[in-house]
Amino acid sequence: MVKSINSELIYSIISHHINHFLNVKKFVKHDYESHMILLTVYSHFLFQTMSKGMSFNWAETFAETETEEHKQLMRDRKLSIFAVSENLLLPQETVRRKLEKLCNRKLLYYSKSEGLSLGKKFRETIEPLGKADGKDIFALVEKFKKA
């Protein structure tokens, strides 16, 4: 554990956050609240797979988002607009409007009976962002190790 964080490390942490924000705009081309909604659905998917004892590497995780098993898992453990709203402390109407745009772009899928799940274009849109973020995070971890 880092006992003290120097200004260079603080700068690196802040730079990581700024880079992530800019990468969302560059790769995904939507606002940050929409991105957090998308990440909430993705996080729900990952948590459900882990709770079933499944574990995937980077490539497998993205491949799994396109399977029937993913769709069934998300139906069985339905995620609602209300749950996303509560999780992100956003008004339900805001979540609903942003969700509509994400669904139109096929990043997410939503129906009242099946709940929220990752859409057909999730992988092709988010995987490049994940790779860019991953590089930044690993570089940040190395700086923490050196501190």
Q: Where on the chain are the PLM-derived regions?
A:
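Short helix->loop/beta-hairpin flanking segments within DNA-binding domains
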Residues: 37-77
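N-terminal leader segment of winged-helix/HTH proteins
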Residues: 1-40, 44
